[in-house]
Amino acid sequence: NDKNLRLRGYKFYWKRSDSVKQNIESKNTNTSIAVLPKNQVFEGSIYYENLSEEELGLLLCALQVNDSPEKADIETYQIGNGKPYGYGKIAIKNIRLMQIDPKQRFTCLNVEETDITERIASIKASYKKKLKECYGIDFESDNSISTYIDFVNMDNADDYLGTHEYTYMTLKEYTNRCPLPLAKAVIGK
């Protein structure tokens, strides 16, 4: 409802090689987190139902944005409450795509899965084509998407941030902050 309102940018956290010390301003705003040791391996499944091929392509792009195996090996994402402090960096590897016939769910006791992993690239391509047709957005050249891909492919921001000490603002500093530069300007691309 404010005519002067403008977006100040995207919320993201720099990937760091070392954890950052917390800026303890007030005990009322502190949160405790439990940190897992490095190099933990987890296995999981995502079950989907009634997705169009394009919607499934979007889900697959969200899980692994790069199509080439070499680039997919360097992708990392950040999850959890520890992101601001350099924790929570994960890699999603070995994606397998299995499909079941929905009719079998109601006619058979043992529903058979069909491995369609080899179709992942074409399913992603179907989503990218639909994105272009319906919204005029080219996945490969859109600024927001390419900025996101740059962050996903960045191992850590140490090279980009240099030796400066980057800390997070205190609550009082948020009120009059200026918009940040575009991520590409900081990364230098």
Where on the chain are the PLM-derived regions?
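Basic, Gly/Ser/Thr-rich N-terminal segments that form RNA-phosphate-binding interfaces in CRISPR RAMP
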Residues: 1-189
